[in-house]
Design a protein with these regions (language model features):
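Catalytic donor/gating beta->alpha subdomain of glycosyltransferases that bind UDP-sugars
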Residues: 149-150, 156-212
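Conserved donor NDP-sugar-binding/catalytic core segment of glycosyltransferases
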Residues: 75-110
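Glycine-rich, basic loop-to-helix element that forms the pyrophosphate-binding segment
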Residues: 3-5, 40-59
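Short beta-strand-to-loop acidic/aromatic patch adjacent to the donor-nucleotide binding site
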Residues: 61-75
Length: 308
């Protein structure tokens, strides 16, 4: 078998919790995993779970150099830890190294396949990592870990703060983890996109006015395609219905995105689905942006946006 289950310091919430995923914590303990229980009087976020697990490790292993973070629905490839450690040992200016995450069952649905395409990021220096990554403890401590107030997008936000401190992030050409998105319905995909919009908005709120204008472009793109264009077309159509033809800008955008991604050689059908998903996602993402806006305006804490 090409992978093994990593020994993780995981977290419990009611039942077993590993960064927000419910499972049997008794089974985890039987496998030799240490289970760390969260204080449920404090609102749960994956960022808080990661921080508490990391801090427990650091306190009990003071000489620890690196921590491998893994999402609860992932399995680590057996040769990944050595490859990641070798890279970090030889590159002291890097805070994070990550590899290729793959979908375990891409054939089960087009949505799983879209996730697998999303995981296929470019090899080389990166702006951010995902939930699976080997992180240097000294760098993690320098930025005080993840922002526990974020309900999504905590990894790119922490990576932004690391880069401000002159740390680097690297994506190496190596298989890292297998992930089970388990997305088989359109509604699941919709909620996942909505969560992404919420993440963009919350990160932009924190750092959008910095030199990098962090995530501002993403938020503006969402607002432009989901609201500005439809409103403009609707207003013009009041004067002359012929302006409805401007709605063709959306299928044209799908074709443009498909053309720009032709080098991925996904096949005609998957390429079109992938391009269409990027364009259609602007609407659920906009709902995520709006939800963040209302939560911020009325001083409400954000709730996790689950998709499975």
């Amino acid at each position: 078998e090409c992978y093994h289950r990593a020994r993780l310091y995981a977290l419990r919430r009611q039942r077993w919790m590993c960064l927000g995923d419910l499972d049997s914590f008794e089974r985890a303990e039987s496998l030799g995993v240490h289970v760390l229980c969260l204080d449920l009087s404090i609102p749960f976020t994956a960022a808080r779970a990661r921080n508490e697990g990391a801090n427990y490790l650091i306190q009990n292993k003071p000489n620890l150099d690196y921590i491998q973070f893994v999402d609860g629905d992932c399995i680590i490839y057996s040769d990944w830890p050595k490859k990641a450690n070798d890279f970090m040992n030889g590159n002291i200016d890097y805070a994070i190294v990550c590899g290729r995450r793959r979908e375990r069952y891409p054939e089960n649905s087009i949505y799983n396949q879209l996730c697998d395409i999303e995981w296929d990021t470019s090899v080389g220096d990166a702006l951010a990592c995902g939930g699976d990554a080997l992180i240097r403890v000294s760098a993690f401590q320098q930025v005080d870990g993840y922002d526990e107030g974020l309900i999504a997008g905590e990894e790119p936000e922490m990576c932004f703060r690391l880069r401000i401190k002159k740390w680097k992030i690297r994506r190496i050409d190596a298989d890292m983890t297998l992930h089970d998105a388990a997305i088989v319905r359109f509604g699941q995909w919709w909620n996942r996109a909505k969560r992404a919009g919420y993440a963009y908005a919350s990160s932009c709120y924190l750092h959008g006015l910095t030199v990098e204008v962090f995530k501002l472009k993403d938020v503006l793109s969402i607002v432009f395609w989901a609201t500005c264009i439809p409103l403009l077309i609707a207003l013009l159509a009041v004067y002359n219905p012929i302006f409805v033809v401007l709605l063709l800008v959306y299928p044209l955008q799908v074709l443009k995105v498909a053309w720009l991604n032709r080098h991925k050689k996904l096949g005609f059908r998957v390429t079109l689905f992938h391009a269409a998903s990027i364009v259609i996602a602007k609407w659920p993402q906009f709902l995520g942006v709006v939800k963040f806006g209302f939560n911020t305006l009325f001083g409400r804490s954000g709730r996790l946006i689950e998709y499975k």
